[in-house]
């Protein structure tokens, strides 16, 4: 069950990253604090993404709490790196994001996957 809690946490934190990114693009910069607060108070575009992005982080932390009670930290922490892969792929494939694809990035993602698989590879006891 700890594995599932960790995967829920990874999914939530990945979605939260994407929501926060879209919110930050839509909201005015914090250097103009008055405009930023007005956007928040009047529920301008970006406000909902900011709210749900922060909520996603909170729910992810709750899932992470349950995951850490049921999984060794070394395995649970390795699963967090899957979030990098999800966010990278979503930023490339989701319409409107226009993130460029680089072969070098794909190599990095492949190394991350290999690392996670190595950590989760069953160890034969003698």
From Swiss-Prot:
Protein name, entry field: Probable 4-amino-4-deoxy-L-arabinose-phosphoundecaprenol flippase subunit ArnF
Gene name of the encoded protein: arnF
GO CC annotation terms, alphabetical: plasma membrane
One of the protein's GO biological processes: lipopolysaccharide biosynthetic process
Topological domains, Cytoplasmic: 69-76, 122-126
Family affiliation: Belongs to the ArnF family.
Periplasmic side: 22-47, 98-100
Subcellular location: Cell inner membrane
Provenance organism: Klebsiella pneumoniae (strain 342)
Single GO molecular function: carbohydrate derivative transmembrane transporter activity
Entry-linked PANTHER family: 4-AMINO-4-DEOXY-L-ARABINOSE-PHOSPHOUNDECAPRENOL FLIPPASE SUBUNIT ARNF-RELATED, SMR FAMILY PROTON-DEPENDENT DRUG EFFLUX TRANSPORTER SUGE
InterPro entries with a match to the protein in the record: Flippase_ArnF, Small_drug/metabolite_transptr
Quaternary assembly: Heterodimer of ArnE and ArnF.
Membrane topology: Multi-pass membrane protein
Record keywords: Cell inner membrane, Cell membrane, Lipid A biosynthesis, Lipid biosynthesis, Lipid metabolism, Lipopolysaccharide biosynthesis, Membrane, Transmembrane, Transmembrane helix, Transport
Pathway recorded for this protein: Bacterial outer membrane biogenesis; lipopolysaccharide biosynthesis
Transmembrane segments: 1-21, 48-68, 77-97, 101-121
Domain of life: Bacteria
Alphabetized HAMAP family for the sequence: Flippase_ArnF
UniProt function note: Translocates 4-amino-4-deoxy-L-arabinose-phosphoundecaprenol (alpha-L-Ara4N-phosphoundecaprenol) from the cytoplasmic to the periplasmic side of the inner membrane.
């Amino acid at each position: 069950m700890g594995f599932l809690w960790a995967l829920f946490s990874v999914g939530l934190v990945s979605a939260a990253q994407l929501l926060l990114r879209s919110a930050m693009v839509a909201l005015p910069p914090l250097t103009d604090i008055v405009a930023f607060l007005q956007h928040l108070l009047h529920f301008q575009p970006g406000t909902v993404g900011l709210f749900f992005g922060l909520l996603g982080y909170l729910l992810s932390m709750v899932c992470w709490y349950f995951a850490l009670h049921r999984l060794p930290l070394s395995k649970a922490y390795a699963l967090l790196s899957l979030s990098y892969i999800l966010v990278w792929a979503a930023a490339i494939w989701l319409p409107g994001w226009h993130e460029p694809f680089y072969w070098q990035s794909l190599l990095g993602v492949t190394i991350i996957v290999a690392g996670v698989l190595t950590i989760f590879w069953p160890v034969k006891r003698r």
